[in-house]
Design a protein with these regions (language model features):
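An N-terminal structural lobe/cap that precedes and organizes the functional/catalytic core
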Residues: 2-107
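Expand to "…catalyze enediolate/carbanion chemistry for C-C bond making/breaking, isomerization
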Residues: 3-4, 222-223, 229-262
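Short cationic amphipathic helices and targeting signals
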Residues: 63-67, 125-127, 134, 203
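Conserved active-site and cofactor/substrate-binding residues in soluble primary-metabolism enzymes
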Residues: 67-71, 75, 107, 141, ...
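Generic secondary-structure signature for well-ordered alpha-helical cores
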Residues: 81-85, 151, 155, 207-212, ...
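Internal, conserved structured core segments that host functional sites
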Residues: 110-176
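An internal, amphipathic alpha-helical element
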Residues: 166-239
Length: 262
């Protein structure tokens, strides 16, 4: 089992924005959810503004909730339209991600990219179990194709380690992987979310570049956890927590898919 020796505890812009969107239930006060196309969106760019009964939705930072693409805007509108008597942020992972991106990523893209690089430096897929052999084989099955993709598509050659001992990655490999990071706040923010949810910047990058599906990515993330549950039985609390995180991961994957590689 792989245990990171580097603990990524940051107080960066993404974390600050996430704290501002902690779930609190509020009674639903609107009837209609609409999209106003061509209005000023994030950072003054044209986008698709979300409105409740004709009034623009504001983020916790008092910015306009506007998406850069029509499909993404429709997905956001669907979340708001699906709310019942109360507005439940837990059931709105895409809106929470959008708020985080708009409030926390736009003015801090270099810092967000640096956080992704930290994850890449001690990525999940670089650390393999010393035993048993069937677990090592399963890790290789899910993770080796990602390493091959990084080598062929990005020119990044990473080193593998066994157990819990940290393995320093070549600066050139990290530089080449980071050169594939997006430069707009929406995709960068979604990539950061996928990275922190999976513990793997490489899996997130592969998702961005269509080298892996969201379902396969999520399965790859849980190789070790699934193995343990097969050996010792399932943990209902852990599975419930995984379900919440999967919803958040799917929101990030949706942003990456709808906005494309650009």
């Amino acid at each position: 089992m792989r245990v990171l020796l580097e603990v990524h505890q940051t107080d960066g812009p993404v974390e600050a924005a996430q704290r501002a969107v902690r779930p609190t239930l509020r009674r639903r006060f609107y009837e209609m959810v609409t999209i106003a196309a061509g209005e000023a969106g994030h950072e003054g760019q044209n986008g698709y503004r979300l409105c409740l009964d004709g009034k623009p939705i504001r983020t916790p930072g008092r910015r306009t909730l506007a998406a850069p693409g029509a499909e993404l805007a429709r997905a956001l509108a669907d979340e708001w339209a699906a709310q019942g008597e109360y507005i439940d942020p837990v059931k709105m992972p895409l809106t929470r991600l959008a708020n985080t991106i708009i409030d926390g990523v736009g003015a801090a893209q270099e810092q967000v990219a640096a956080e992704i690089r930290k994850y890449l430096a001690s990525d999940l897929v670089f650390y393999r179990a010393e035993s048993p052999a069937p677990l090592r084989a399963r890790q290789a099955q899910h993770w080796d194709p990602l390493l091959s993709w990084a080598r062929q598509a990005l020119g990044a050659e990473f080193k593998l380690g066994a157990g819990v001992v940290h393995v320093a990655q070549p600066a050139a490999a990290l530089d080449r992987a980071c050169a594939a990071l997006p430069h707009d706040p929406w995709r960068l923010g979604a990539l950061h979310a996928a990275t922190t949810l999976t513990g793997s910047g490489l899996i997130a990058l592969a998702l961005l570049h269509d080298a892996i599906t969201a379902e396969a990515a999520w399965q790859a993330v849980h190789v070790d956890e699934d193995w343990n549950m097969e050996q010792w039985g399932s943990d209902e609390i852990a599975l419930k927590r995984r379900g919440f995180r999967f919803a958040e991961f799917n929101a990030a994957a949706l942003v990456l898919r709808t906005l494309g590689k650009l």
